[in-house]
């Protein structure tokens, strides 16, 4: 009887900690995705202004 109760309490604690871990992991994942999106869009995080798009190859001026 006592062992059964302790087992149930332990499983509830594990479920709670797993739920908290999932929420933390989701928040971290969303943060990384937002950071990657800002980087891909070329937004400068220092002053919040967007940089002009840069070309990988320069066009020859005519």
Swiss-Prot record:
Extracellular side: 41-62
Post-translational modification: Phosphorylated by host kinase. Phosphorylation segregates agnoprotein in cytoplasm, whereas unphosphorylated agnoprotein migrate to the nucleus.
Job of this protein: Alters the structure of the nuclear envelope by interacting with host CBX5 and disrupting CBX5 association with LBR. Involved in the perinuclear-nuclear localization of the capsid protein VP1 during virion assembly and maturation. Plays an important role in the release of progeny virions from infected cells and in viral propagation, probably by acting as a viral ionic channel in the host plasma membrane. Allows influx of extracellular calcium ions in the host cell. May contribute to viral genome transcription and translation of viral late proteins.
GO terms under biological process: monoatomic ion transmembrane transport
Quaternary data: Homooligomer. Interacts with VP1. Interacts with large T antigen; this interaction may impact upon the activity of T-antigen on the control of viral gene transcription and replication. Interacts with small t antigen. Interacts with host CBX5; this interaction induces the dissociation of CBX5 from LBR, resulting in destabilization of the nuclear envelope.
Annotated membrane topology: Single-pass type II membrane protein
Alphabetic keyword roster: Host cell membrane, Host cytoplasm, Host endoplasmic reticulum, Host membrane, Host nucleus, Host-virus interaction, Ion channel, Ion transport, Membrane, Phosphoprotein, Signal-anchor, Transmembrane, Transmembrane helix, Transport, Viral ion channel
Location within or outside the cell: Host cytoplasm; Host nucleus membrane; Host rough endoplasmic reticulum membrane; Host cell membrane
Protein's name according to its UniProt entry: Agnoprotein
Main location: host cell
Organism: Simian virus 40
Cytoplasmic side: 1-23
Cited InterPro entries: Polyoma_agno (IPR002643)
Molecular function (Gene Ontology), one example: DNA binding
């Amino acid at each position: 009887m006592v062992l059964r109760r302790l087992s149930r309490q332990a499983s509830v604690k594990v479920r709670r900690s797993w739920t908290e871990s999932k929420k933390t992991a989701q928040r971290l994942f969303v943060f990384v995705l937002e950071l990657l999106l800002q980087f891909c869009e070329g937004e400068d995080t220092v002053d919040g202004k967007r940089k002009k798009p840069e070309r990988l190859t320069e066009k020859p001026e005519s």
